[in-house]
Amino acid sequence: KQLTEVYFKTDPVVYDIYDGIRLLSICRTARDRMQNLAFCYQMTGETRYADRCIEEMKAVCNFKDWNPYHFLDTSEMTEALSFAYDWLYDYLTPDMRETAKTAIIEKGLNQILEDYRDEPSGRRRTWKWAQSPVADNWNLVCNSGLLQGAMAVAEDVPEIAAEVFDGGLELIKKAVLLYGPDGAWYEGPGYWLYATSYYTDLMCCLDSVFSDTFGYLNVPGIAQTGYYITSITGPCGNFNFHDSDIGSVNSPEIFFLADKLHDAALSNLRMEQMADRGTNGTIRDILYYNPGLSGTAATMQKDYYFRDTEVASFRSDWDDSNSIFLGVHAGKTNVYHGHMDAGSFVLDGFGTRYASDLGADNYNIRDSVWNLYRYRAEGHNTLVINPSKDGGQKLAGAARIDRFESGINSGYAIMDLTDMYKDAESVSRGFKLTNNRSAVIVQDEIKTAEPADIWWFMHTTNDIEVAEDGKSATVKGKYKNLKVSLLADTPGTFSVMSASPMETSPQNSEQNKNLMYKKLAFHAENVSEITIPILMQFVIPIEGLEENYSVPCVPLSQWTLDETGASEKPMLTSITVDGAELPGFKSDRYVYAYRIAADSEKMPEVKAEGSGEVSVKYTASVPGYAVITVNDRVDSNVINQYIIKIDKEILKQAPEGVSQLSVKEVKASSVPQPENSPENTLDGDLTTRWSAEGNANIVFDLGESRSVKYLGLAVYQDTTNDGRQQYFDVLVSEDGENYTQVYSGESSGTTLEEEIFPIPETRGRYVKIYCKGTSVGNWNSLTECTLYGN
């Protein structure tokens, strides 16, 4: 209901082929509005929701077409109107029923029949998806939307509906087989969600109308696919290989799969997503949820490998939002939405994504994707051998995971990348989560016929420092830094490079400049045989508290699971803060957040007990940290560390005695969407916002030096109410040039309303909110900002 209130302040959608090809964003806006409004009418009986929904229905029915040229648009709009037509049927006037039914038939069903028949008809399509011998997300989306439309009007046009049923149900046979053998989706997690959302909608409608899903739920991989999407999602987002964007996949489809497959553990997994990971429910969660399946905890493996798509994931824990997550991908390049990303990986740990995948570029750039940085090997966390205009990996190449093993304290995967590199005799890459799942090894073994130029890349949004000797580097993080070092005396050095094409690569001026990214590079010249063994360990950025783990370099052929047990690592048995037990404490959870009263300035007293010698160190002030170190009683070099981030509580309103400060001017570092300007953060309207991608900032000029004590911040949530948390720093300046950081925090992700953050009282004229992305992606969106002080 809270989301639908925005619709009453906006006009219905209008026809707009915004990029010369797609109506898609208009279709999705209409879909969200009509389904949310119709659902609220069904739940409350309040006619204002139905009346506002009808305004959207009239608008889309009056469109000249639903853009069958880009047929995804037609499918999405057909489904959207069909839902509204069905859910409001008894409320609609006879004329409105006729209008909606006619639009579904003429603008939807008749269009897909042209594709099914494939007769010369003068139709124009971006491509003939229905005739493609290889299936992808289009197959499920296009057929599903129109099949739902056919079900909505079948009683009135049975012959047309029957032809759509025959054509659509036949075509999706090859699409559902893509979930095999283990539930993965080769186009990446973003297209898994797109395809699976339409697949589950269709299955739900078939079950509702015919009480039968005609065997489409009984294909290889369907029973595992809910576990697939969960397993490749880390604490900081999904493993967005191929054409996927970073973000946490919000998947109510899991409830549907759990219900139809009678999998109580899978149902509980979705419940845990919403309860523990900040993901709020959607309409489909309500529709798909079966309360009779609750109560069975999901038993998730820490490591997964999915064949054919050739993707694997490893993690230290499932219940800790600061756990370590490693996602790795081999696979093929020449597939729909494919990249030259064999051997690539992402790495999360302690609230930071240290190794990032850049995702797709603008689909409308008129150039081969293999000329664009984000699609080439150099744009991924993998190897490039002898850089040239070629993409860096073979277009027809295929890489596979030859060995995968998972144990209690470690897991690893070894890839054969030889087929991807034309100048190589053999290329193997191994990934290992080691040291009781607290460190990562990435090891490459390369042989070439002739001496070669070898590059190793890792992209990140974080700051990087390289040691003077070039043999190690540090990637900065939220709680811990990532120390990257060589395990052997390997020729070559580390350096920091921009995330941009090398001199030997094509230079397309239209492509994304990737300004929020940089990359750590390792370069070895004139080598024909080399092993590059790299250790990545997470270290606390406080002097004297470094934890150093050493391990010998072992050939990949000799890799085994770690034999040492977790019990050998000293653990805490309790932590108290000011005499009270630390909420959520677990011996194997190493990062905590603790909030004190907003008016308190005193660091709380932290005490702990454990299996070793315990010591506690604090930073000087709040917000800050308490770091607990446990040394083994026998070998003091064996240590374990726990971190408590201590901050002040977030308030719902500013306390008495402070005033709202007036703002003379507001500016932003970038305004990529003119309608989402920085001025929107001062208009008192939670339906408007300022949005910018990546590391962006917004600056408020108070006109004169003022004392600033509190920041009010409201964060945009999308139509799925996705629970996004905004990460930000607060900096203050007297002259607008020299800034001092005074606060670093994150929104709760639980409300659309403004939250009040206590910050250390600071004088200044300019206040900068430095935004660092959200828990679901790289876009920052602030709806309101208010400063309070004296």
Describe each model-derived feature in a short phrase.
Residues E675, T681-Y743, T750-N790:
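Aromatic, loop-rich ligand-recognition surfaces of beta-strand-rich domains
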Residues I365-I575, L582-D588:
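CBM-like, beta-strand-rich accessory domains located in the C-terminal region of large
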Residues D562-G657:
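Beta-rich interaction/scaffold domains
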Residues R31-T47, A59-N67, M77-M96, C142-P158, ...:
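Well-ordered alpha-helical scaffold segments within catalytic/enzyme domains
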Residues V14-I21, S82-G190, D285-Q301:
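Active-site lining segments of carbohydrate-active enzymes
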Residues T126-A130, V153, Y191-Y354, S406, ...:
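Carbohydrate-active enzyme catalytic cores, enriched for enzymes
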Residues D11-A30, N62-S75, R117-V141, G180-Y194, ...:
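Solvent-exposed loop and edge beta-strand segments that line ligand/cofactor-binding
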Residues K1, Y41-I54, Y85-L109, A150-L169, ...:
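Structural helix-adjacent loops and short alpha-helical linkers that scaffold large soluble proteins
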